[in-house]
Amino acid sequence: MDKTLINELGDELYQAMVQRETVTPLTSRGFDISVEDAYHISLRMLERRLAAGERVIGKKIGVTSKAVQNMLGVHQPDFGYLTDAMVYNSGEAMPISEKLIQPRAEGEIAFILKKDLMGPGVTNADVLAATECVIPCFEVVDSRIQDWKIKIQDTVADNASCGLFVLGDQAVSPRQVDLVTCGMLVEKNGQLLSTGAGAAALGSPVNCVAWLANTLGHFGIA
C-alpha cells in the first residue's frame, strides 16, 4: 500500500474519532490491506493525535484471548497506543457520550513499568523485573468502524480500537499476586456482567507484555 493511501486512511480514522462518526470497514473497500499496512495507518492516526497536543503514555495489547483470535481469524494479539487524553482516575466521571461512538467495557490489568523493555529476546523474568506494579484497569474500547464489523486489519488500523480507560487505585507488586489465576469481576450497579482470569490472556498477562516488547523490538521501539 502506498504512503498516500496510508495517510488518507489514517486521516479518515482520525477525523471519524474527532467528529464521532463511523466509517465503512477498510477491508470492505476492494483494495488489499495487510496487517503491516494497518499498523502504518494507525501510526498516521497517532501522528494526528500528537500534532493536536496529546502525548503517548503507554500501549494497549488487544486480541489476547483465543475466542477473539478465532473470531478474527488470527493467532496473535495486536497493539495500539495510549495517550494522556484517554486516561481517567478511579472515581472520575468519563464523558463517554461526548468522546466515544459505540463503546464497550472490558476489565484489564495495567502494568506500570519502571524501565523500558526492548525486544527481541524479552522474557517473562525481564517483564517482572521491569514492572513497578500492576493495577486493575477498566477499559472502554471504541471502534470508528461501522457497527464493529471488523477484521484484524480494521482494528489494527483503528489503533486497536482504543477508547478510554480508568486506572484503579490499588497497586500491587506483580510478585505478590498470581497473575495467571487472578480473577476479575465486572459489575454494573451491583449486577455481575462478566468474569475472567489472567490465564485467558495468552496464558498469563506477563506473556502479553513480553509479546509486545518483542514485537515492538522488531520496529526499534521500546
From Swiss-Prot:
Q: Establish whether keyword Lyase is in the entry.
A: yes
InterPro entries membership: Fumarylacetoacetase-like_C (IPR011234), Fumarylacetoacetase_C_sf (IPR036663), Hydratase-Decarb/MhpD_sf (IPR050772)
Question: What highest taxon heads this organism's lineage?
Answer: Bacteria
- Name the enzyme's class: lyase
Q: Biological process GO terms, please?
A: benzoate catabolic process via hydroxylation
Kindly give the SUPFAM superfamilies that the UniProt entry links to this protein. Answer: FAH
Q: In which pathway does it act?
A: Aromatic compound metabolism; benzoate degradation via hydroxylation
Which EC number(s) does the record attach to this protein?
Answer: 4.2.-.-
Instruction: Kindly state which keywords UniProt assigns to this record, in alphabetical order.
Output: Aromatic hydrocarbons catabolism, Lyase, Plasmid
Xref: Pfam families = FAA_hydrolase
Gene Ontology annotations for the cellular component aspect, listed alphabetically: cytoplasm
* GO molecular function terms attached to this record: 2-oxopent-4-enoate hydratase activity
Keyword DNA repair listed? The answer is: no
What PANTHER family does the annotation carry? 2-KETO-4-PENTENOATE HYDRATASE, ACID HYDRATASE
- Physiological role: Conversion of 2-hydroxypent-2,4-dienoate into 4-hydroxy-2-oxopentanoate.
The UniProt family comment states:
Belongs to the hydratase/decarboxylase family.
Q: What is this protein called?
A: 2-hydroxypent-2,4-dienoate hydratase
